[in-house]
Amino acid sequence: MSGSRGNSSNSSVSNNSNNNNNNDGGDERLLFLRSVGERNEIGFPSRFKSAHYKKPTRRHKSARQLISDENKRINALLTKANKAAESSTAARRLVPKATYFSVEAPPSIRPAKKYCDVTGLKGFYKSPTNNIRYHNAEIYQLIVKPMAPGVDQEYLKLRGANFVLK
């Protein structure tokens, strides 16, 4: 029995020493990693990066700033050209050049995409009775054809194509 007591006390002592060793091992590991990090640092500046380079504080301008800057640039060009044109009698009025930033663009020439009012898929067909767009014949047979008169106006209202009788 005395031998087992001694073993248990020895095991607790050895556990404490293991805990100390684990902490020492962690400290050794940190010291090792720090020494490796110090060895990896380059003592001279890289030839690929300028020594005077500063990271810009802001990368992109907001859309409002881009539009206002573009308008200022266009107005400056127009006033300069108008002053030159006032001296000549041939060109009295200058039209601004179309740019990507001009907000006053005409509507698109491309036709608007048409979607099914029921499913949201591409609407290839349009019902002749109530003007509801539908994707295929199955949707027409099951949903559009037996639709009640008030319900079709609700679908058209979602699209903004409803008509109100006064």
Swiss-Prot record:
This is Chromatin-remodeling complex subunit IES6. One of its GO terms (cellular component) is Ino80 complex. The gene is IES6. The keyword Repressor does not apply. It comes from Saccharomyces cerevisiae (strain ATCC 204508 / S288c) (Baker's yeast). Component of the chromatin-remodeling INO80 complex, at least composed of ARP4, ARP5, ARP8, RVB1, RVB2, TAF14, NHP10, IES1, IES3, IES4, IES6, ACT1, IES2, IES5 and INO80. Keywords: Nucleus, Transcription, Transcription regulation. One of its GO terms (biological process) is regulation of DNA-templated transcription. Present with 1720 molecules/cell in log phase SD medium. It holds the Pfam family YL1_C.
